[in-house]
Regions:
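Extreme N-terminal basic, low-complexity initiation segments
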Residues: 2-14
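Short, Lys/Arg-enriched N-terminal segments with co-localized hydrophobic residues
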Residues: 15-25
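Generic beta-sheet signal
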Residues: 28, 74, 165-176
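Active-site-proximal alpha-helix that buttresses catalytic centers in soluble enzyme cores
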Residues: 28, 32-98
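Phosphate-handling substructures
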Residues: 48, 94-154
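Glycine-rich phosphate-binding loop signature in dinucleotide/nucleotide-binding domains
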Residues: 67-72, 159-168
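GST superfamily/GST-like fold recognition
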Residues: 176-180, 204
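Domain-level recognition of soluble alpha/beta enzyme cores
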Residues: 187-211
């Protein structure tokens, strides 16, 4: 079930529902992918799930399957990076629902550091970490915090418009950095990469938003 971390929020009902004062509510369940290889830099790396990550994903899939009437998920949306795809596929297979991949819900593009061993990244790019970047400062051949925020916020706005007419719920499989931005948008808070964000667990429902 949704754990203590879960953020519950109302994003906004479709216009026709607001005009007629009809209570049309569907939910978006947002999860971070299962555990992947922590010995390399993540971002746009195409690392696979670890054995534990697969186990975590199967556990969530079982929970969603056993409580289908409660969750009522008819479609999964996912980042197209491998660790998210694997997580989404495990759940989709269990629930027998389709997946749509959205590349704009990828983690931050960390350019040259993507998939690089941690020790090598520290050697080549000492002390280069997400929270230390300035707003307009890029990862080498990658994104700046400003660009990452713009990409995700635009994708989220488009996503909400696309699903707002659904009468069943959807699941979004994405990444920690993306979830941090989405929660700021939902809560109406200013986003900064320098914020100390709460650690988001793997393969558990992190956000439950009503539309």
């Amino acid at each position: 079930r949704a754990n203590n971390f879960t953020i519950k929020a109302t994003v906004g009902r479709p216009l026709i529902a607001r005009i007629l004062n009809i209570k049309l509510i569907m939910k978006i369940y947002i999860i971070r992918h299962g555990q992947d290889d922590a010995s390399v830099r993540g971002g746009w790396s195409n690392t696979s799930l670890t054995a534990l990550g697969i186990q975590q994903s199967n556990k969530l899939a079982d929970e969603l399957f056993q409580n289908q009437s409660e969750y009522n998920i008819f479609k999964i949306y996912s980042s197209d990076l491998k660790r998210a795809r694997q997580t989404a596929q495990i759940i989709a297979d269990k629930l027998s629902v389709p997946i749509e991949f959205i590349s704009d819900f990828r983690e931050v593009d960390n350019g040259e550091l993507a998939g690089m061993d941690n020790y090598l990244a520290e050697e080549k790019y000492p002390n280069l970490y997400w929270r230390k970047l300035n707003w307009d400062e890029h990862y080498p051949n990658g994104e700046s915090p400003k660009e990452f925020y713009k990409r995700v916020s635009n994708a989220w706005e488009k996503f909400i418009k696309e699903i707002s007419h659904y009468d069943k719920n959807v699941l979004l499989v994405t990444h920690g950095g993306v979830i941090n931005i989405i929660t700021c948008i939902i809560d109406g808070k200013e986003y900064s990469n320098k914020n100390k964000n709460q650690k988001i667990p793997s393969a558990e429902i992190a956000v439950e938003a009503e539309v």
